[in-house]
């Protein structure tokens, strides 16, 4: 399967660089189990879900992971904290005119807080902060909004690039689980009133989510690693949902990857799991848990487009995307949503 099989033309003006005034005011394109698409508003999910269905949401929180700084010589640098190893050490991306070497001292924030480059881990730098990382990020960091916004993070992003249900204790992502950004408290309450249940997994989203696929044959692509947790409480609800004939609805590709990683770790069995995942889902993958997926519109030739193509199929997804472009849906993180049903075979 070739990378070019997942290409499509997207006019630049359809990239949503700011959120709508109301979270749940976005549009929804439903791709059903027969491969037919239907136009809706996002709030229509109340009518598209059944009593007893289960929403699975990712409760991670986005860090203000981007830090501006400088070298001892004064040259500008930028640090993106990818993963904290302990309260003062992290794997980081560093942008600089020349790659810093082990032992280099850098300074971040307006108060020039010292950090030391301790070495490398694969394509990342091991960076030791002279103070606890999270307070430094909270005071001096910026939310790492996606590169295709072509702008710096603004005040509106502080609220709108976080989900309303994030767990403050789980602050470790460098990108939002964006399908969840469509849910506000009012919509969640209405779903609850209908009898749609909800549960949580955690997947801390890494910067690798924005990395392009660089191999022509997609099966040669190596996925980035992300930490996830699928607790027993969530598994119990999934098993009960399936036992009564209801649907498990993953909210976002991150929730999907967490759930399917747990199943793959147990040979396809639905069971709890915590660990690092590099799962790469593309057409031909057999889903073990996910019946339906709420997701945003994804970049051409991205691993996320490949994932959604595995749930329906590539032809149906690209036809739906072509319709979305013609009908001027808004794309990417602050854009509109899709509801994709597992294709009937």
Curated annotation (Swiss-Prot):
GO terms for cellular component: cytoplasm. It holds the Pfam family Queuosine_synth. GO terms for biological process: queuosine biosynthetic process; tRNA wobble guanine modification. Gene3D superfamilies: QueA-like (3.40.1780.10). Pathway: tRNA modification; tRNA-queuosine biosynthesis. It catalyses: 7-aminomethyl-7-carbaguanosine(34) in tRNA + S-adenosyl-L-methionine = epoxyqueuosine(34) in tRNA + adenine + L-methionine + 2 H(+). Its main location: cytoplasm. Keywords: Cytoplasm, Queuosine biosynthesis, S-adenosyl-L-methionine, Transferase. It is found in: Cytoplasm. It is an enzyme of class 2 (transferase). GO terms for molecular function: S-adenosylmethionine:tRNA ribosyltransferase-isomerase activity. Its EC number is 2.4.99.17. Belongs to the QueA family. PANTHER family: S-ADENOSYLMETHIONINE:TRNA RIBOSYLTRANSFERASE-ISOMERASE. HAMAP family: QueA. Monomer. Transfers and isomerizes the ribose moiety from AdoMet to the 7-aminomethyl group of 7-deazaguanine (preQ1-tRNA) to give epoxyqueuosine (oQ-tRNA). This is S-adenosylmethionine:tRNA ribosyltransferase-isomerase. It comes from Acinetobacter baumannii (strain ATCC 17978 / DSM 105126 / CIP 53.77 / LMG 1025 / NCDC KC755 / 5377).
